Amino acid sequence: MGEPEEVMPGSGAVFTFGKTQFAENIPSKFWFRNDVPTFLSCGDEHTAVVTGNNKLYMFGSNNWGQLGLGSKSTVSKPTCVKALKPEKVKFAACGRNHTLVSTEGGKVYAAGGNNEGQLGLGDTEERSTFHLISFFTSQRKIKQLSAGSNTSAALTEDGELFMWGDNSEGQIGLENVTNVCVPQQVTVGKPISWISCGYYHSAFVTTEGQLYTFGEPECGKLGLPNQLLVNHRMPQPVPGIPGKVVQVACGGGHTVVLTEKAVYTFGLGQFGQLGLGTFLFETSVPKAIEHIKDQKISFIACGENHTALITDMGLMYTFGDGRHGKLGLGLENSTNQFIPTLCSNFLRFIVQLVSCGGCHTLVFATPRLGGTEEMELKEINKSCFSAATSLSLSNLSSGIVLHQTLSARVRRREREKSPDSFQMTRTLPPIDGIPMPPVCFSPSPIPFYMAASNWSGKMTPEKEGLTQPEPDYFRDNMAKGKETDNSSATDSESLGETTDVLNMTHMMSLNSNDKSLKLSPIDKQKKQETIEKLKQHTAHFGNDDSKGCASEEMSKTVKEGKAYKQLLAKGIYMTQAAMTMEAFSDEDIGNDSGQPGPRADTHAEGVQRKIFSCESKHGLYPPDFKAIAKESDGGQSQKDPEAEETVSEKENELAEMAGLQARRQSEENLRNINMFFDDLPNRDVNIEDEESKDFVKDSRRNKQDVIFDSERESIEEPDSYLEGESESQQGTTDGFEQPESVEFSSGEKEDDDEVETDQNLWYSRKFIEQGHKEETEHILSKFMAKYDFKCDHLSEIPEEQEGAEDSEGSGIEEQEVEANENVEVPAGKEEKEIEILSDDLTDRAEDHEFSEDEEPEDMAEELDEDLESKKNVPADVASDNSLKKDETTKQEKRAICEYNENPKGNMHYHAKSSSSEVLNDSESTPNKDVKKSKKIFLFKRMSLMSQKSMQSNNEPLPEIKPIGDQIAFKGNKKDANQNHMGQNHQDTSPPDMERRSKSCTIL
């Protein structure tokens, strides 16, 4: 389909869809030189093609020898059955695991499975080559062959019907036998014109146009009233079908009937194979398909769970189970269709033949000459706008109406078919992540547009793969998906120069992702409570995974430099946090306070941060920051690819400019922030604390990821965000709240749940990550500002508030780090350091959880007083929340002033004093608060620590003997102190990044 029309011969080609062995799950086509197909038949997993030269070609599964090629090996290419070359093959019929072939001379051959005698050879031994059924002679000319699960049928031109094989459900019309190994005639006293065998039921049409059915009676597939089902083993006429029946087709659990004027269906339609819409899943009463009532149908075909129709104009409609793309609707659409859907790919072709199997479809079509455009417009309009008519209330009058079981995907399909689809998709985005207009995501002003559009663009070619792969596939290929998807997504998003960086980032972040995946178990255990709360804000999709993966490695590294890192985390966090806060305090606060909750839903980190901002908005941010919020909103709202590009570049410039302005603004911001946090209610702080934990998770993951690239981290976070978004959309469609859906999408759940929406995760990650990229950079500045004020506040602000801010800060921190990482961070060192820091943080968080009061003291003993004071400050800060707002305000002011004068020494000293104060308070405060705040604080610190500890605590580093690459941080002590987030990255990062972090921290 993707190749130009000229490549195909004028005689046409055979198109394959679904799992055909010829091209797994990928639409493909083939044709014969100097020959054309005249008959197609699809079995459960194998296919037969008869050509005009009376040759038989077979391919597909062959575990029972059903291809008749003399072996049982799978054949992926159409292969001529040479044994039948002397015979002129006319018809073929493929069952579940056997094949029937008839010749012009009236002979019938069979091959394959024979456990029920379906080969008609008088025994039940399977055959791997075609054997002649002696019952049929040249006296009987075969008109039609049909094969079911384990049944066979042959209809002669004289109207005689012969059936054999399995009769456990009466599917061969014999009353008192379970199976027969030789053909038996089935008659109702009238000549028969058409026969069809389903999996466990059969139907035929008499020359008078009367339909008879027999076999398995469940699900209404026989179309008979209950009183007639007693005799289901014998052919009985089906009432309720007006007009003369021309054809009948039996599927796995449904039956399709073609009359001279309409198409009727009955039976089971849970996949949409009845074509009666999403409100009727089962009916025993034949119902006309209203959607194609204006079309003249010339041929019908049924697979196990899908149906195909050919019109007299050579157009094809398909509906039912869309898995593997067997409906032929394109790579981007492998979803179930509940009403006949026009195969637009065949508008330029005339469909001649179609056959449906268990998991695939074959179509023979010839190029359409002229009139293609007019027909295209005409048919598309009809198919697009007549969908609603098929859902008329008349369909609800009878049958089983299943509203609750209606899947979100189904509802989405319904909406896609109706004119209101776009409005509905706004509130209920598609589950599968099928590309939808950006309009559907309009509710979220964050770079969602870009992510959505790019996502759709990327998803279109790869979506099918996504839907098909199993959950593990996503996990295994997460890194690869992020690399390729992110790089391609960045290209599509017009990130420009950042594209290469993103690619590098993805390469680098593959390891971090794996590690992060390892980390999740520890963090999950520690933060189960937080996660539960986060479910509402579920923006940490990647965080849990990253934590889980890194947890194992972290536990090891944590043991080595646990105390050191903890102290560093606190001290560094204190110092760098204040510095960072100074630079970005305005933007950070503005974004947090200004961003609405809905936005938070759009991005993973954005969700958390935004949620914080919404909650903290009331208490955390005063009106003075509204302008800042607007600015930050504007910055983040730049979701377009260009916006992101410019944002990322601007972020670098802003970071540098922030250095100059940071000092002035940071001082004012710090003061304002101090006032803010003093005024902040504990409730907001608590909420933020838990969220901050989540952010800490994010920051931890970001730390690991930071090594690779800040952009990548931002991308990963957007990933989770997209994931959340798509899942939230799914959840909404399913009736769940977006937060829940987001949570499911967060982590591997989505991937586990669902395969189809699971690759969406990658794509969504790409786009979201890109979207986050901008936010991350914006947030970097914000985060820097927050941390600048936070460092001062760490000692002064209550732990809960601090933790809340830290959580926000950590989110920002992560983004900051990501931005800094974007600059150019040695993946190896930063990775290791970040991992170690994150590991230490997790361990520290655990230690803090168990003994926070003791831990500050122990840490103080182990490390320098500065580190000790810092460490104590975080733990104490949690307890200080309400008690020491005044003290924190004063101390923060002092700390800010001192820090501005001498960031390292003063900050550490101030941290000590504040930590001592906080320690007193923390001892009085409950362990839970301290634990939460410490956890959050530790993780954030770790991110800050990894950078700050390397930076501000340069002296203690040699004493502590930094683990792995931590020593590398020594080189950039100044930079580290200046930019706790960015330093780890800055050590390897270009001077620009150093400037950014420095400008932010130099305050």
Swiss-Prot record:
Tissue: Isoform 1 is expressed exclusively in testis. Isoforms 2, 3 and 4 are widely expressed.
Region (Disordered): 460-495, 625-657, 691-760, 794-932, 968-1003
Keywords: Cell projection, Cilium, Cilium biogenesis/degradation, Cytoplasm, Cytoskeleton, Flagellum, Golgi apparatus, Guanine-nucleotide releasing factor, Lipoprotein, Methylation, Phosphoprotein, Prenylation, Repeat, Retinitis pigmentosa, Sensory transduction, Vision
Propeptide: 1001-1003
Phosphoserine: residues bearing it: 418, 520
Record flagged with keyword Repeat: yes
Any GO BP annotation: visual perception
Positions with biased composition (Acidic residues): 716-726, 797-821, 849-867
Keyword tRNA processing carried by entry: no
Lipidation (S-geranylgeranyl cysteine): 1000
Medical condition linked: Defects in RPGR are the cause of X-linked progressive retinal atrophy (XLPRA) in the Siberian husky dog. XLPRA is a naturally occurring X-linked retinopathy closely resembling X-linked retinitis pigmentosa (XLRP) in humans.
Descriptive protein name: X-linked retinitis pigmentosa GTPase regulator
Native species: Canis lupus familiaris (Dog)
Taxonomic path: Eukaryota, Metazoa, Chordata, Craniata, Vertebrata
